[in-house]
């Protein structure tokens, strides 16, 4: 039989699917979309993306972004790999247990996707200088913590500047794409500070963390979680006075588990397991690999849409529920025009004689701020830092000087203040906000009717 003529296979371009989005027009493109190879190359060569979190969602995000044409990625995560991560955080292997998540995730994606460069950062997000985050075009969030989201939201909104008419300056907008999952549920959202609601504008979407009354834990435990929290919150302090409990220390977790078992047996309560103990103590949110994959895909697509304008971005909050079938919905939430984080800032009118120390006291007394232990920055100029002690000592002499002089004798300017805000339950949270300072009596400044309590 004669040999059949088999046509040679044409190699498929790695960017074939991406080219369909970036090289041609469409009915749903953003008005600013300019298709062409140059756009694809710019995304590859110049766009820098920071992925925060290298867990279940973060692993998916790194993979999806690398396969979507982004070549300059960085990832930050403070955690190390645990055995319990391996079933859903697909970039990790058993031999990786104990290693930093960010470093292993970056290494694995670079091994699989040629040409991509991923810089890992094994650290807390708070340990990075604020300007570190300003070096990126987009920040993609794969976090499981409300506190971490609020911190990054404050940082990104801190870069935002407003025009005289209180419209945001486009070049100062730091886009964020936020994803979150819990079991079969998830969300993806686009945050354009000053344009769409920031995280603080919609904080009401997140329910308060469940807390157990201590009297219930001590006297009438009714379920396994009560027994675990009793061992964690009460017995640990009683037995190990002065020793800090470390949830990432296996010996500490084993001690809590053993004590919870004894407590449960005493009251005839079933269900205490080691995995449940970890979940209760560390407030672990249940995660499913398929949910992470779906939400990550939505986040990666929104990231591509923001940088390329190949389609209009999500407006502005996508919810997903895969518990009973498949359900998605997009909701348009509105900005809080008086938001202390993404808004133009609280307006405070001062005399030119007001000292920095007096101004910091005013921040604590202001009814809309209630900001204690405040640090103050004016652009790149640090006026005062509460911590670390060596910096506080360095800036301390400024406290007695007029704020007007420290700010370069400008008539008005926007400054950033970082401190702790009092909550209704007497707890405090770290926050960043903007304050618009106007000096009465300075040349060229007309009297304003906005007082310190406005």
UniProtKB/Swiss-Prot annotation:
Gene Ontology CC terms, in alphabetical order: cytosol; nucleus
CDD domains, per the entry: Uba3_RUB
Compartmental location: Nucleus
Tissue and organ expression note: Expressed in shoot, root and floral meristems, in vascular tissues of cotyledons and mature leaves, and in the stele of the root.
Induction data: No accumulation in response to auxin treatment.
PTM-bearing positions, type N-acetylalanine: 2
Cross-referenced InterPro entries: E2-binding (IPR014929), ThiF/MoeB/HesA (IPR045886), ThiF_NAD_FAD-bd (IPR000594), Ub_act_enz_dom_a_sf (IPR023318), Uba3_N (IPR030468), Ubiquitin-activating_enz (IPR035985), UBQ-activ_enz_E1_Cys_AS (IPR033127)
Pathway: Protein modification; protein neddylation
Keywords (A to Z) from UniProt: Acetylation, ATP-binding, Ligase, Nucleotide-binding, Nucleus, Ubl conjugation pathway
GO aspect biological process, one term: protein neddylation
Enzyme Commission number: 6.2.1.64
Active site: residue positions: 215 (glycyl thioester intermediate)
One Gene Ontology molecular-function label: NEDD8 activating enzyme activity
Pfam family membership, one: E2_bind
EC supergroup of this enzyme: ligase
Main subcellular location: nucleus
Family classification: Belongs to the ubiquitin-activating E1 family. UBA3 subfamily.
General function of this protein: Catalytic subunit of the dimeric ECR1-AXR1 E1 enzyme. E1 activates NEDD8/RUB1 by first adenylating its C-terminal glycine residue with ATP, thereafter linking this residue to the side chain of the catalytic cysteine, yielding a NEDD8-ECR1 thioester and free AMP. E1 finally transfers NEDD8 to the catalytic cysteine of RCE1.
Note: The formation of the adenylate intermediate is possible in absence of AXR1 and without the participation of Cys-215.
Quaternary state and interactors: Heterodimer of UBA3/ECR1 and AXR1. Interacts with NEDD8 and RCE1.
Protein name (Swiss-Prot/TrEMBL): NEDD8-activating enzyme E1 catalytic subunit
Organism lineage: Eukaryota, Viridiplantae, Streptophyta, Embryophyta, Tracheophyta
